[in-house]
Amino acid sequence: MFSLHFPQVSYSDPWLQPLSERLATLNRRAVRIAYFYEEPNNSTFRYRAYNMAQVLNAQDAENVSASYFFLFDRDHFDEIADCAQMLVICRSRYCHEINGLITKFRARGKRVLFDVDDLVFDTDYTHLVVATLGLDVRQDRLWDDWFAMMSRMGQTLKLCDGAITTNEFLASKLADFSGLSVSVVPNFMNQEQLSLADRVYELKAEACFKGNGRKTLGYFSGSPSHRLDYAIVEPALADVLAQRPDVEVMVVGYIEHGPSMQKFAGRVSRQPFHDYVNLQRLLGSVEFNLMPLQSNAFTDCKSELKYFEAASVGTLSIASPSFTYRGAIRDGENGYLAKAH
C-alpha cells in the first residue's frame, strides 16, 4: 500500500449553479449546445453532460459553448430552445415535459441528439439487465419499474435525430434498435479529478512507486448493483490472502463480503462511499484496482472509466476481458486481463 500524506480535499458539487449562470455560460459563444438530464447526479450526468460541457467550454478556438439543464428548469425551456443550436438529451425517460422540450427544438429547426451510456433503452434486454444487477426477479413491481423505465428511455431515443454513446459495442445496439446514426464519444475525467490525480501521481513518482511493503488489492464499487460482479473475484481474493500474508484487500462502497473473507478480517479494510474527487486519493493508495464483470451483452456496454481513473493515479488494473476493457488494456503491459475461474 502507498502511504500518501495527502489530506482529503473539500468537495461540493461544482454543477450546482443557478439557472442564470448556466444560461450565461450557454450564451458565451456562437455555437451553443444544451445538455439535458432529468436531475443532477455524480454518475451519468457527470460523465455525459457536466464533463462534456466543461471540455467544450475550455476550447476557445472552437467558438463553442455548452451548458446543462434539468427538469426543474421547465419554465425556461422556451428560452433554452431559443438560445441553443443543438440539444443533447442524456439518458432521460420519456415524459410530456421532455417531449415538449424536444418539440420546441424541432419547431425551431434545431437538431436533437440522444446520449446514453448503458443498454437501458431496449426492453428485449430487460431480463438480462435485471439478472446482471442481481435484483429480486420474484417481485412484480420490479418488472413494472424496469420495463417502464427502459421503454420510456427508448421512446425518448426514437424522438431524436441521432445518438451518442460511449463505445462501439453499445453503438451497434443503439443503431439496431433505433435505426439512427450513432457517434461514439468515450467517457473521460473532468478537470477536478485530473487536478487531484496529478498530485497523487506526483507523490507516488517522488517515492519511486515504493509502498509500505504490503500489497493492497482495491475494489471500488459505485453502487450495490455490482454485488454479483464482486462475487466473481471474491473466491480468488480469499485464495490470495491465504497464500500471501503480505496482501491486503480494500473494499470501497456498498459491497458486503461473503463468508470466505471473514477469517481474513484483519487484512480486509472497508471504506465508505467517497465523492468522485477524493476517490482518486483512495485509488492511488492501492497497488491494484480490481474490475471484475460478468460476461454478457449488458456488461460489454460498460465503459472503461474505472480503468482510466485508476491509471491516472498510477494504479494498475486487473480486469475481466469485457469489450471495452480488452480495448483499453494491453495484457501485461498497461494492466492485466483475467477471466473468472
Per-region residue spans from a language model:
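Nucleotide-sugar-dependent
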Residues: 122, 228-231, 275-282, 287-312, ...
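N-terminal pre-catalytic "stem/leader" segment of glycosyltransferase-like enzymes
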Residues: 1-88, 127, 228
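A short, active-site helix/loop in glycosyltransferases that binds the activated sugar's phosphate group
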Residues: 156-184, 188-194, 256
